[in-house]
């Protein structure tokens, strides 16, 4: 027989983005830029925030831009208050430096500086949550090393773990009014990698050769993962991996 679907019973399963107010920290480059453009394409009114004023003024297509450093707590608080109320809050801002190499040989000041990403996210979540509307969402970008740390990635792993732990703890505090999730990318082709041409291709080949999908991902693919956790109203307190099988790779 014909399947009868009660549309009222599934109403609200997915957030409609048309007319929703979205704020994307780190929204003018890499994964953040891809997210900004995808949200705008889906009808959201997007404000992209960057610590570099030149980048912040480079977008068009109805996308608003603001300059703000996520490590400047007062500036973060002010810009979020200005943009309130917010339906969708995303932070993909790196916030600081990245330290690589064996922990026992690592400059501990460099290791400490890596945690600026966490403090930037903490500022955005702490001051953003009070301006997110009922039924809204917050999404953080972590990273695959959080749960599969390869040699030399202790700083990335530590910071990623801290970001995801904060997300899970905050999810309990803000539920059911707000949902908060993390999206964890693997190796992604973004401007953060300085190498060019064949050197860049070889670097990505070496980094992904043991992945189940042996290539670097694209920022647009991560943005699709971010869009998923934003739109699905039954997802909170979780991490969605967009990593080409990084977590299942052989050492």
Identify the meaning behind each predicted range.
Residues 28, 36:
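N-terminal Rossmann NAD(P)H-binding glycine-rich loop of SDR-like oxidoreductase domains
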Residues 94-110, 194:
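Conserved mid-core segment of classical short-chain dehydrogenase/reductases
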Residues 187-210, 249-251:
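A glycine/serine/threonine-rich, flexible loop-to-helix segment
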Residues 215-242, 247:
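C-terminal substrate-recognition "lid" of short-chain dehydrogenase/reductases
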Residues 164, 173-189, 235-242:
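Conserved Rossmann-fold SDR core element
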Residues 102, 108-123, 130, 137-175, ...:
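Catalytic loop of short-chain dehydrogenase/reductase
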Residues 60-74:
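Rossmann-fold cofactor-recognition segment
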Residues 25, 86-95, 140, 181-185:
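Rossmann-fold scaffold of SDR-type NAD(P)-dependent oxidoreductases
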């Amino acid at each position: 027989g014909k399947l009868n679907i009660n549309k009222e019973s599934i109403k609200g399963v997915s957030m409609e983005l048309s007319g929703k107010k979205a704020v994307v920290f780190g929204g003018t480059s890499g994964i953040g830029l891809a997210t900004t453009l995808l949200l705008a394409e889906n009808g959201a009114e997007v404000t992209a925030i960057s610590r570099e004023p030149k980048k912040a003024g480079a977008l068009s297509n109805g996308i608003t831009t603001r300059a703000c450093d996520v490590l400047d707590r007062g500036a973060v608080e002010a810009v979020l208050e200005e943009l309130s109320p917010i339906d969708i809050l995303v932070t993909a801002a790196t916030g600081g430096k990245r330290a690589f190499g064996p922990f026992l040989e690592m400059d501990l000041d460099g290791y400490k500086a890596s945690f600026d990403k966490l403090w930037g996210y903490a500022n955005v979540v702490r001051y953003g949550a009070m301006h997110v509307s009922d039924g809204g969402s917050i999404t953080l970008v972590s990273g695959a090393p959080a749960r599969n740390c390869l040699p030399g990635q202790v700083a990335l792993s530590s910071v990623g773990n801290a970001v995801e732990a904060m997300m899970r703890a905050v999810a309990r505090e803000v539920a059911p009014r707000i949902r908060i999730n993390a999206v964890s990318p693997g190796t992604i082709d973004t401007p953060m990698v300085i190498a060019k041409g064949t050197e860049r291709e070889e670097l990505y080949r070496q980094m992904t050769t043991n992945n189940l999908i042996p290539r670097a991902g694209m920022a647009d693919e991560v943005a699709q993962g971010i869009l998923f956790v934003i739109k699905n109203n039954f997802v909170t307190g979780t991490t969605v991996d967009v990593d080409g099988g990084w977590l299942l790779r052989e050492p």
